[in-house]
């Protein structure tokens, strides 16, 4: 990370896409995408996804590391080009507890991530706990972030400290996505970004963390990009010019969250304007979902009814029987809720792919289609971009390859934005 940031600060319009997903096919797609490019790949886990108690994936930080390393080994991707990050590390998961106990757990969370070899750490203590006022005083946020940083510094080995970097601040929706519709986005004011930096510097120095301040590479801000279930707010560079200008006077860059579904030109403009770390998550699993739905349509054409995976029906059955991950997010009307379940940009379906019934039906879908020849016309009908790539000779038409390439469509847009010499 330090090399990428220093190159950006030296004047290169270079950035990095942060892949925020625990889905094995998404991680495989990212590693295969940059297998021969020489680029670093940044993969991040969030605190609610992966923590010392297992998170919703059931993985602790060391488990997630081994999970990613296992995929890297299968792909042949060298570990030295992998950067592991932890996102929203702080009391996010324990906001309903008193601040003291939430912070104790947050300290252990940080220690677990750093000990497991995660080198990009987002120190996020912005959320109010059960006995806190709302919103929190910025100095309280900074002091708590400094305590988390202290835990990281005391845990890291000398070798780990060579690579250890911190991200501070937050200007983002609740980790996991917006719960309601958005109409407009407040772009961070440069004076608020400056205050975030100043309060964190003071809090770090008060704990003797002067050396750690040199590891702070980025501030999270809101440049004016967002999405909800049905709409996208696109980047408007002119609205963020003052913010973009301010960061030039610091040794840092910005980190932008929720950059999913922006245009490739928007990614290039964001990187140009010093939002050099672009986070993406739901757009990747949205592309995965599109690929699986497309393959299900092909299966309906090619496989007899009694042999089909019924993947679409299984998804509906599971999500309707177990609505915990989508009910409070989606529209209450039945017909609208079904549209959201299938096609929402926030892609709450991503939480259901590990479900045993859904996983088995996806495996059967892929096995069924591996046993037949996929007609080019059918691929053109349901996956037209992949059909073009087949015609160009850069893709072979297996179900697995089609899924991987569909996910990589998203990564291609980020590569355009993060790499100035890509046309």
From Swiss-Prot:
One of its GO terms (biological process) is galactitol metabolic process. Gene3D superfamilies: Aldolase class I, putative tagatose 6-phosphate kinase domain like. The keyword Isomerase does not apply. Pathway: Carbohydrate metabolism; D-tagatose 6-phosphate degradation; D-glyceraldehyde 3-phosphate and glycerone phosphate from D-tagatose 6-phosphate: step 2/2. GO terms for cellular component: plasma membrane. Pfam families: GatZ_KbaZ-like (PF08013). Keywords: Galactitol metabolism. Belongs to the GatZ/KbaZ family. GatZ subfamily. HAMAP family: Tagatose_aldol_GatZ. Component of the tagatose-1,6-bisphosphate aldolase GatYZ that is required for full activity and stability of the Y subunit. Could have a chaperone-like function for the proper and stable folding of GatY. When expressed alone, GatZ does not show any aldolase activity. Is involved in the catabolism of galactitol. Forms a complex with GatY. This is D-tagatose-1,6-bisphosphate aldolase subunit GatZ. It comes from Salmonella schwarzengrund (strain CVM19633). The gene is gatZ.
